[in-house]
Regions:
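Enzymes that bind and transform nitrogen-containing heteroaromatic metabolites
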Residues: 1-145
């Protein structure tokens, strides 16, 4: 369950973004009925995953091609801020392909889950910019090295 400090941080990041990108698994698990900016979903599913969100668009493309498609959507802007709220599978793939420039992590030291990630491996090509602890959450930001 998302903690108040984590929820606040998510809302701040969303307010600074032009679009949100999620994977199909995240779209099936999380409610994205209303987003302040367009929502793009990378999925192989033909079923509309967020039917109540008028700003949602599904892309049946690999991550690099999906980002190009999203960039075309924002062609009038010099640079679009795309917030990726992905699970471990999509996030790892995007990091391996060097598609993530800035990485924001929330580490909850009390939580356990089925999707355990090797953090050292995940951030090996990134440089730590900041780390702030609020209660049991640790907020870290990294930049691609």
């Amino acid at each position: 369950k998302r903690q108040p400090a984590d929820r606040k941080r998510f809302h701040e990041l969303r307010s600074e973004s032009d679009a949100i990108l999620i994977g199909g698994s995240t779209a099936r698990r999380e409610p994205y009925k209303k987003t302040p900016v367009p929502l793009f979903i990378i999925t192989h599913s033909l079923v509309r995953l967020q039917p109540k969100n008028q700003l949602a668009k599904q892309l049946n493309l690999p991550p690099a091609a999906a980002l190009q498609e999203i960039s075309n959507f924002f062609a009038q802007k010099e640079r679009a801020q795309i917030l990726v709220e992905a699970g471990p599978k999509l996030l790892t793939k995007m990091i391996e392909e060097r598609l993530i420039q800035t990485l924001y992590l929330t580490i909850n030291h009390d939580a356990t889950g089925e999707n355990i990630i090797d953090l050292a491996d995940l951030v090996k090509n990134f440089k730590l910019l900041s780390s702030v602890k609020v209660e049991n959450d640790e907020f870290q930001s990294f930049e691609l090295a």
